[in-house]
């Protein structure tokens, strides 16, 4: 196990973001004995540590040169994107841009004529985009992130190149958690 993986496990425990309880269910309806709430990473130290862990992961897998912009979906992914690019710079001297989406397009101020769905303007024509988020269950939400990117590119007359996604926690289980309550068998997931 890599040090950043150990650090994540300790951070999940310390922050109580990982907890166990009967009667929990995932967004797709599957029962689960545990849940992870990255919303509890709500201090400067915790989000900074989480960003460092993600930056270390990206560098360990040699992904830091594979993207230009790190996009974090609203809401939890936004803070994660900022913390990760900051840690890439501070710990690895890798400078990358970040952006995150709005739930509704902005039509005033600097976005008066563009109805911008992204905040920082980091998405430039031809840029390579890595999407980063906290947890995945079925990947449906992550694939949904491609639509706002495509819409933004079309509105600006640009092209963006999604290169992948980075996650803190993969909830895609390969076997059912409770066989009696979820008789579908290994690998079956509900609709997210």
Identify what each model region corresponds to.
Residues 1-132, 137-192:
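PRPP-associated nucleotide enzymes
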């Amino acid at each position: 196990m890599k040090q950043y993986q150990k650090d994540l496990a300790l951070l999940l425990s310390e922050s109580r973001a990982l907890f166990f309880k009967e009667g929990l269910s995932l967004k797709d309806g599957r029962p689960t004995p545990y849940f992870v709430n990255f919303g509890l990473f709500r201090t400067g130290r915790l989000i900074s540590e989480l960003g460092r862990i993600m930056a270390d992961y990206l560098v360990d897998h040699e992904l830091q040169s594979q993207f230009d912009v790190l996009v974090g979906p609203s809401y939890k992914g936004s803070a994660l994107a900022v913390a990760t690019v900051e840690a890439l710079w501070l710990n690895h001297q890798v400078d990358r841009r970040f952006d995150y989406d709005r739930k509704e397009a902005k039509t005033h101020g600097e976005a008066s004529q563009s109805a911008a769905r992204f905040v920082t303007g980091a998405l430039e024509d031809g840029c390579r985009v890595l999407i980063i988020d906290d947890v995945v269950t079925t990947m449906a939400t992550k694939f949904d992130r491609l639509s706002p990117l495509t819409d933004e590119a079309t509105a600006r007359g640009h092209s963006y190149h999604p290169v992948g996604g980075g996650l803190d926690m993969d909830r895609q289980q390969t076997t059912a958690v409770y066989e009696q309550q979820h008789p579908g068998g290994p690998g079956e997931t509900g609709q997210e």
